[in-house]
């Protein structure tokens, strides 16, 4: 199959790509699983609370077991006491979900294929800036009628990276750093020809 190479003036030529990487049927369940697994793996999981054992103090029994008329108590750090520990306190945990490499790559193929079908994949000859200026990047994106885009390059230049940092609807990634969430998050995905070829090698 072939993808059109786009210029500010319109389509200019095509680039041949593999059906394996850009012509797969969309598998919604697989893509959903990949997205959920990626987002779960991105969680910090550092939330922590103190249970009755972790709260400082409470080593001494506050009063004797019998004879006071009060309810029996073994520690002042019981969860039912003020300043006591938390019942079922949250602990740090790893939310990572296992996803086989084959499934992950297959999900990327599905997403890229669907982007191509929906004409959300914009292939350009090259995408770089002469200076690290956000204004220049905005003007360049406007030439392609883009405001919300992920820019994928084989190797991201420092100028492009610095220029895109201040745009919350624009992100820049090299081929090795793309993921399912970033691909579906943006309205358009701008990809250089060299990035397409590199991605084809990885996913074929």
Swiss-Prot record:
Keyword line: Ribonucleoprotein, Ribosomal protein, RNA-binding, rRNA-binding
Cellular component terms per the entry's GO annotation: ribonucleoprotein complex; ribosome
Pfam family, one: Ribosomal_L4
Subunit structure: Part of the 50S ribosomal subunit.
Recorded family membership: Belongs to the universal ribosomal protein uL4 family.
The protein's role, per its UniProt record: One of the primary rRNA binding proteins, this protein initially binds near the 5'-end of the 23S rRNA. It is important during the early stages of 50S assembly. It makes multiple contacts with different domains of the 23S rRNA in the assembled 50S subunit and ribosome.
Protein's recorded name: Large ribosomal subunit protein uL4
Organism of origin: Teredinibacter turnerae (strain ATCC 39867 / T7901)
Higher taxonomy: Bacteria, Pseudomonadati, Pseudomonadota, Gammaproteobacteria, Cellvibrionales
Gene name, Swiss-Prot/TrEMBL: rplD
């Amino acid at each position: 199959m072939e993808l059109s190479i786009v210029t500010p003036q319109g389509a200019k030529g095509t680039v041949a790509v593999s059906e394996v990487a850009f012509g797969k049927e969309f598998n919604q369940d697989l893509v959903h699983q990949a997205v959920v697994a990626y987002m779960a793996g991105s969680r910090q999981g550092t939330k922590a609370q103190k249970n009755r054992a972790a709260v400082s103090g409470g080593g001494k029994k506050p009063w004797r077991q019998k004879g006071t008329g009060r309810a029996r108590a073994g520690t002042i750090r019981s969860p039912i006491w003020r300043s006591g520990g938390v019942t079922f306190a949250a602990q740090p945990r790893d939310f990572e979900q296992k996803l086989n490499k084959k499934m992950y790559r297959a999900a990327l193929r599905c997403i890229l294929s669907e982007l191509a079908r929906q004409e959300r994949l914009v292939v350009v000859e090259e995408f770089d800036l002469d200076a690290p200026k956000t204004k220049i990047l905005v003007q360049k994106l406007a030439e392609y009628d883009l405001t919300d885009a992920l820019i994928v390059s084989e190797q991201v230049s420092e100028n492009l990276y610095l220029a895109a940092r201040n745009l919350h609807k624009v992100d820049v990634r090299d081929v090795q750093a793309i993921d399912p969430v970033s691909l579906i998050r943006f309205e358009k995905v701008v990809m250089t020809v060299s990035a397409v070829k590199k991605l084809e090698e990885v996913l074929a």
